[in-house]
Design a protein with these regions (language model features):
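Short hydrophobic alpha-helical segments that form membrane-spanning helices or hydrophobic packing faces
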Residues: 131-138
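An N-terminal alpha-helical hairpin/helix-loop-helix interaction module that forms a charged
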Residues: 1-123, 141-230
C-alpha cells in the first residue's frame, strides 16, 4: 500500500491549520486531554465537556446528528470514562499496534459506544463509527477518524470492499500495514508537525501522532476522490 503522493497531500492540508482554522480544533482538544490529569478533567468538568463538544461541533459531528439535541452535560459520562484510563493510552500509536494495544483500542471503542450511542442510532454503523473515531482521535490521537472522506480513501487504497464503517481488528491491521508501507514519510511529518497552543497561538512541542498524519492523508485523498466523481 505504498503511496507516492503523501507529502503533496499533507502539505496541502497543513496550509489550512492556522490557530483560528477549523482543522486546528483537533490541536486544542488533543492538547487538553493529553496534558491534563484525570483529577483536572473531573474538577473542571464543564470545561472538559466544552473542549470535547466544540471539537466535535467544529468537525461537523452536530450536523444531522442526535448530538444537535444535546447540551454539553451529555458529554459528562465520556469525560468520567476518559478520566478512569491510565496515561498509557496516550502512548498508543500506529507504530505500536501490538495485540495488547489493539485490544485496548477496541475496548475503549466498545465502551464509548455503549455510553453515548442511542439505541435508535445503532442501526447506522457508519455514523456511529465516525463519531466514536473522531472522539478517539481528538482525545488520544491513536486512530484516524473514520469519516466519509477517510472511508472513501482507504476503500480505494486498500481495495477492501467492506470499507471502514466500524473499528475492528481487520481495519486496524490495514491501517498498520499502510503505516509500515509508508513509514518514512509518515514518521517525518509526525516529527515536524506540532500542535498549536490555544493561549499563545504558537506551536507547542507536542507532535502530531502518526495516526493523525494518516487521518490527514486519508481525508485529503477522499476529498479529491469525491471531487473527481462529481
Amino acid at each position: 500500500m505504498k503511496q507516492e503522493n503523501i507529502k503533496e497531500y499533507l502539505y496541502y492540508y497543513l496550509l489550512e491549520t492556522n490557530p483560528t482554522d477549523r482543522y486546528t480544533s483537533f490541536d486544542y482538544c488533543y492538547n487538553y486531554f493529553k496534558n491534563n490529569s484525570s483529577e483536572y478533567l473531573l474538577n473542571n468538568m464543564e470545561k472538559s465537556c466544552l473542549v470535547l463538544g466544540f471539537y466535535l461541533a467544529s468537525w461537523g459531528m452536530l450536523r444531522n446528528s442526535f448530538l444537535l439535541q444535546k447540551s454539553i452535560k451529555f458529554y459528562e459520562p465520556i469525560i468520567k470514562y476518559i478520566a478512569e484510563l491510565d496515561r498509557s493510552y496516550w502512548s498508543i500509536d500506529v507504530d505500536n499496534y501490538t495485540d495488547d494495544n489493539i485490544n485496548k483500542i477496541l475496548k475503549v471503542y466498545e465502551d464509548l459506544e455503549s455510553k453515548i450511542i442511542p439505541i435508535n442510532e445503532k442501526g447506522n454503523p457508519a455514523e456511529a463509527g465516525t463519531l466514536l473515531t473522531k472522539i478517539l482521535l481528538g482525545v488520544f490521537g491513536f486512530i484516524p477518524a473514520f469519516d466519509t472522506n477517510f472511508l472513501k480513501a482507504f476503500k480505494f487504497i486498500s481495495k477492501y470492499n467492506k470499507g471502514f464503517k466500524v473499528v475492528n481488528l481487520n481495519n486496524l491491521k490495514i491501517i498498520s500495514e499502510f503505516y509500515v508501507s509508508n513509514k518514512i514519510v509518515i514518521d517525518e511529518f509526525a516529527s515536524i508537525t506540532k500542535t498549536y497552543d490555544f493561549s499563545t497561538g504558537n506551536k507547542t512541542n507536542i507532535s502530531y501522532t502518526k495516526a493523525k498524519i494518516i487521518d490527514m492523508y486519508g481525508f485529503m485523498v477522499g476529498l479529491k476522490l469525491k471531487k473527481v466523481k462529481s
